[in-house]
Amino acid sequence: MNRTEQKQQAFQFIDSHRDEMVALWQEVVNMEGGPHEKPGIDLVAGRFRQVLDEVGAAIRTVEFAQAGNMLIAELPGPIATPGVLFLGHMDTAIAAGAIARQPFTIRDGKAYGPGVLDMKGG
């Protein structure tokens, strides 16, 4: 499969799963997880762990006492295939209480809420 076909396949997948992707996006944006808020960050990590488990990833959680836990996940695939690394954080720069003031919303085709354009947005 050439790159054009790969891109078309990726866009078709996104188009066919758009509603569930937006629902997950809304769910994690509406989870409090500001700086140094371990319980909220761990909640986000737990939700992403569920998603990764559903797609067959091998997942390891690295627990921290005073910071949000870290997920390490590997998706099965041929060893000879070039890999792809996704790296991100699950907290936001917004302090606790932001969700009550500005929950995830979509207006005029644009998404709003803490973290929508940061790592909670992918």
Label each PLM-derived region with a short phrase:
Residues 2-116:
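Acidic/His- and Gly-rich active-site-bordering loop/insert found
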Residues 117-122:
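Active-site alpha-helical elements of protease catalytic centers
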